[in-house]
Amino acid sequence: MTDPSLNGILGLMQLTDSALPTGAFSHSLGFETYMHAEQLEDQESFSAWLEMFVDQQLTYTDALAVRLVYAATDFERIEDLDDLVTAQALPRQVREGGMTMGKRLLSIGARSYPGDWVLRYQQGVDEERMHGHQATVWGVLARGLDVSEDTAVAAHVYATVISLTQNAVRGIPLGQNTGQAVIRAAQEWVGRAVATSRRLSEEGIAEEVLGAGAPGLEIAQMNHERQRARLFMS
């Protein structure tokens, strides 16, 4: 018999694997705008951008969203969070990308790990009553897998870091070994995202500061819509 905790970890590894067909390979979440402006050209410049992205946007959006899902006491709260988390993503490409990847993640998760909330979420998306934002979808799936809140936050942030780094490897381009060096360095930033989001949650202000990202990054993400030539959808 497999240890239940091991089942949860294995499920987490499946659903956060970069090979999962969610379409993450087609999103830069704004770094292509900086790349087009010749501000991202090597390991040092991409690492600086990625650290800023984790510290100033991902921590205050997806990390907090996962924690708010864990704090929910009924599914009606999940419906509210799905609206809130989707609405706070101001750049259109980022908002639509979050929904597209979230719906694919939910579809896979509903077939592989069909818990009550997961199936209700899928029904809500199918009936176009819910958006299926990736962060709230992941929070619901992680709760169903019975992994700890900190682990769920870390897994989602780290999976995003890996996807973006893999995209930078082929987009900038960077070497494969360089990409691995960036991912190793990013583990510290993931730890900060976990700690900061935990503190904000414990202080009871997670919902209040949700979406409090860096305006410059959001503007760059918006400008991406009007770039002449694009490798990525966001």
Which residues does each predicted region cover?
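Secondary-structure capping and boundary motifs in well-ordered enzyme cores
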Residues: S5, A19-T22, L58, V94-G97, ...
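Glycine/small-residue-rich interface belts in oligomeric ring/scaffold proteins
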Residues: L12-F75
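C-terminal auxiliary extensions adjacent to catalytic cores
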Residues: Q39, Q43-E44, A155-S234
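Alpha-helical transmembrane segments of multi-pass membrane proteins, especially transporters
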Residues: M52, G124, A154-A159
